[in-house]
Amino acid sequence: MRTIVHLSDLHFGAINEHAIGALIEAVGALRPDVVAVSGDLTQRARAREFTRARAFLGELPSPQIVVPGNHDVPFHNVVARFCFQLSRYRRYITPDLEPFLMVGDDLAIAGLNTARSWTFKGGRVNEEQVTRVCERLSAAPADAARIVVAHHPFDLPPGVGDRLLVGRAHLAMALFARSRTDVFLTGHLHASRISQTGKRYRIPGHSALVLQAGTATSSRERLEANAFNVLRIDRSQAVIEHFVWSSTGMAGAGAFKTLGQERFARDDDGWRAE
């Protein structure tokens, strides 16, 4: 099985400084095949924030696949927001907004940019970019696990309004179903959750896993402490572990500890919990 560490919503510029070292140590100990970061590397897209984010990524194992989030688009500078929306992200993190990795012949993982200058908080995709991502995934070997990394969610917890769903989600999911996408790794909500697309989209023969990661390092915690996910996957099964920051209360010391795991097996319609 391949191991993917999924981090999201780092928010350099407003971080829990005590968690940084422990996170680097925890991720390194897991010896992942891929580290995926699903956006919001910075708080306000400032150069100094991107500099710290770049240094942090340099402390993590490779290969990595990273996509931007809405906080990586300038907020207060209107000219930069609309004319140079991701220029700093491209300069400090990666020029590729839709990266793609093939790990061996059994894991295809694609990045999808959902950040837009005109939506401020929300995200959106278009048919052209989703088609491009799907073509890459479809070209992978038949038995490869197919994963998409995006900042904005393709599914939501009960009671959360659909306005937080990525724009054109239903159009995108129809295309992802054709490319047999297995898993979505997303962020934005600062809350960890596992769900399946079949309950929302109801596409016959397709139900992908949606792994929502909390914020790995932000001091702006909402529903949980700093957290990240670990996905172990092959074509027939998936195992997800959820790691949460636990402070000892001694000068901010602490560690990321696992809260157990959930297991899923594949059948003809997608994934089922074991």
Task: Name each model-derived stretch.
Residues 1-59, 75-76, 97, 132:
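N-terminal active-site segment of His-dependent metallophosphoesterases
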Residues 7-8, 34-40, 64-70, 113, ...:
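Active-site neighborhood of phospho(di)ester-bond hydrolases with catalytic His/Asp-centered motifs
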Residues 13-15, 43-48, 70-81, 116-121, ...:
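Active-site environment of divalent metal-dependent phosphoester hydrolases
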Residues 21, 49-53, 126-131, 162-172:
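Charged helix-capping and loop-helix junction motifs
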Residues 51-132, 140, 175, 203-206, ...:
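Extended active-site neighborhood of metal-dependent phosphoesterases/phosphodiesterases
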Residues 142-157:
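Short acidic, glycine-rich surface-loop motifs adjacent to enzyme active sites
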Residues 162-236:
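Conserved beta-sheet core of the metallophosphoesterase superfamily
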Residues 232-274:
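A short C-terminal boundary segment appended to hydrolase-like catalytic domains
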